[in-house]
From Swiss-Prot:
Domain notes: Has the structural arrangement of an alpha-helix connected to antiparallel beta-sheets by disulfide bonds (CS-alpha/beta).
Subcellular location: Secreted
Protein name: Toxin Aam1
SUPFAM superfamilies on file: Scorpion toxin-like
Gene name for this UniProt entry: H1
């Protein structure tokens, strides 16, 4: 039984798992995309399953994306937007 678990874990690590996450999509400088024209289209173009408008305190209305790939940057509250 333990061998089966170890083999399954090894296969999972070898195959690799593409993880996804939800978040506010941003430009490379941690500046959010605002909800005009459409968040759903923007999010889907970047590999998400869907998108909608959300609100961030001190930032305003921004695009919230569901199931974004790891390579797409999302909003990080610890960094400010700079252009």
């Amino acid at each position: 039984m333990n061998y089966l678990v170890m083999i399954s874990l090894a296969l999972l690590l070898m195959i690799g798992v593409e993880s996804v996450r939800d978040g506010y999509i941003v430009y490379p400088h941690n500046c959010v995309y605002h909800c005009i024209p459409s968040c759903d289209g923007l999010c889907k173009e970047n590999g998400a399953t869907s998108g909608s408008c959300g609100y961030i305190i001190k930032v305003g209305i921004a695009c919230w994306c569901k199931d974004l790939p790891e390579n797409v940057p999302i909003y990080d509250r610890s960094y400010k937007c700079y252009r």
